[in-house]
Amino acid sequence: MNLIVCHLGGGVSVGAHQKGRVVDVCNVKDEGSMGMDRAGGLPVNQLINYCFSGKTKDEVKRTFGRRAGMFSYLGTTDFRVVCAKVVEGDPKAVEAYQALVYQLAKDIGAMAAVLHFDVDAIVYTAGMAYEDFFCDDITAYVGKIAPIIRLPGEEEMRSLAEGALRVLRGQQEAGQY
């Protein structure tokens, strides 16, 4: 089975899963879509200028790692607040929201290419996947690639703990990433 998994939480990532293995991923810490408080991919020349603007390394990391993304536009990392502003028609919120949807759609398309467009499903996970219209807006771009599966919720820590337990019990080997 080949999947594109879109983790839509505080951090955002879009991964290509080919027959049970992650073969590529766009992750908000380094590239791809912005997240709620992370910048995602940035224009290199502007980034270089910012890094040499007198800011310390810690200031630059804090800006792009905790004060960027949707937070830099709307002053919040709460996606429910962002969605409420979008529904109210707040122009700044609508513009930032549309940029997020567009960036995610591009990342999903890129991961489809990685899988040679042999995609069994696109999966939306984590807290932002609770928002129907958000998922619908992304799907408007990518829905022709593969069926959509929504698994909203915050199960990351439980999944990590269960995986560690399987390794400790000898039921699974620890992976190297």
Region annotations inferred by a language model:
Residues 62-117:
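Adenine-nucleotide phosphate-binding core of ATP-dependent small-molecule kinases
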Residues 44-52, 58-65, 80-83, 105, ...:
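Predominant activation on well-ordered alpha-helical scaffold segments within soluble catalytic domains
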Residues 4-9, 125:
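Short beta-strand segments
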Residues 2-3, 11, 19, 23-79:
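Glycine-rich phosphate-binding loop plus the immediately following alpha-helix
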Residues 119-138:
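Glycine-rich phosphate-binding loops at beta-strand->alpha-helix junctions
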Residues 129-130, 136, 147-177:
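Glycine-rich phosphate-binding/hydrolytic loop that grips phosphoryl groups
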Residues 18-24, 30, 137-146, 171-173:
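A glycine- and small-aliphatic-rich helix-loop capping segment at beta-alpha/alpha-beta transitions
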